[in-house]
Amino acid sequence: MSFTDRPSYRTAAPMTDFDARALAASLAEILGPDRVLHGSEARRRHPGDMSWLTYVHAQHGRPLNGQDVVASPRSTREVADVLKLATRLKVPVTPAGGASGVQGAANATCGGILLDLRSMTRVRNLDRRSLTCTVEAGMIVKTFEEQLNAQGLSFTHYPASAEWASIGGCVAARGSGVLSTKYGTIQDHVLSAEVVLSDGDVVQLPALPRHGVGPELTQLFVGSEGTLGVVTAVTVRLRHLPAHRKFAAYRFDDLARGIEAGRRMMTSGVRPAVMRLYDREAAIHSLERAVTAGLDGETMIVMFDGDHPTLVDAEAAVCRDICAGEGARELRPGIGEAWWDKRYVFYYPPHAPQLPQIWCTMDVAADFTRIEAVYRNVTRAMREAVDPSWGMTVKTHLSHWYDWGSMIYPRFGIPKGPDDLDAALDLHDAIVRAATLAAIEAGGVINDHHGVGMRLAPYLERQFGPAGMRLLRRIKHGLDPDHVLCPGKLALRPEGQGERPTVTPAA
């Protein structure tokens, strides 16, 4: 597939009822009949992820959730037994957790088995002295955080999708959370992992992330989107709940001055727990709807936290000086507090987009040298990709910062897309293609933390280069030679393979 081709949104034809029943019977011997679904019930109960692609295909009667059977293991041993069976029968397996992704990665487009990990929710070990915790992959992030908060602790990885996202899903997509600027993304939280390979081997990786015992294999599976192995548990770092939080908000004359303020903070060691910079359109038409503060242009919200108020105040003071040095005007701190209290309203009606709209939130990373050019090129490419008569809006903010750069969140929205599915996909794909290629050409990386999924798979070779893709394919072949795990995801389909191999499971 050329990197400019539309992603494949086809779903494999379902197994015959006989084959699906036979596969379900084999799985029931492993899990028990109450934890196996097949046929239309398997698809009805598990409709797919939260991407626009999933919603619009379902609306038009062409759903992307093509699983023939759903299997719900409760233990690592059961996961291993399911994978052994699947490998023997050459049946595709797609692991899934909360299905909160927005790229289509958790959709079982090749049919076969959807491995529902949501029953694996145990906290296996909590070490209060080392501030580490071993938790199973099906645990929902919000539930985990609430359990920790009751003990004065925090995971500090808290994505916008925390109410639905599973720990394993965050690991699979290399996710990020609202506090990442200080506490890091999921890769910084994960210390070790338990992984089941496609042949059923269970790998328990070293319990410490810093060692000289060869490569750090845990990180091989972070961001692998289920293609290399099934992560069944992870050991993660924890923190104490902060005793103090301090908010501030600033109005900049333009986005470039705001980016420079953020760069100066990050490169001087100042670490806000939250730093969100909104361009004019996002400040006026998104943030303002939540905080009601009369915002009229580029706005930055920052939050500092910690156990020692003197240190929190000192960092906030340095931030104030840096922002003032970039010409910013300080706004009332209640704006930041209002955002914090309402930070999840954006994901519910009336704030969240709904069909018949077309929407997509991209997340593109770049270093500080290139981030402004990436912002300009990507947002311009989005606007130029479609006729103005569609009334598309583009609203952008920067919310995950690093000591080397940041990322942009440009969300495009079209109030009403075409009634025809293929025409709607053409419109959506034209915008995504233009923005993705513009990001690459400007020196950016096409995704920061939402993952690749179906939407970005055609562009992986352009991002990695031919040699990089050959390396990734060699890793895939070494760990999953039969391509049982998520075939085709991460552009890792073997040559000549269709949407799903022909499978006739044994009765």
What are these model-derived regions, one by one?
Residues 1-84, 102-131, 282-290, 335-360, ...:
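N-terminal flexible segment immediately upstream of the FAD-binding catalytic core
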Residues 121-276, 500-507:
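FAD-binding subdomain of flavoenzyme oxidoreductases
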Residues 201, 452-507:
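Activity-critical C-terminal alpha-helical subdomain
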Residues 101-106, 170-171, 217-232, 401-405, ...:
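Conserved phosphate/anionic-ligand binding catalytic regions in large, soluble enzymes, centered on
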Residues 32-36, 433, 440-452, 477-485:
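Alpha-helix capping/hinge segments and adjacent helical runs
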Residues 37-53, 240, 251, 257-434, ...:
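C-terminal substrate-recognition/cap domain of FAD-linked oxidoreductases
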Residues 86, 226, 480:
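Conserved, mostly hydrophobic/aromatic
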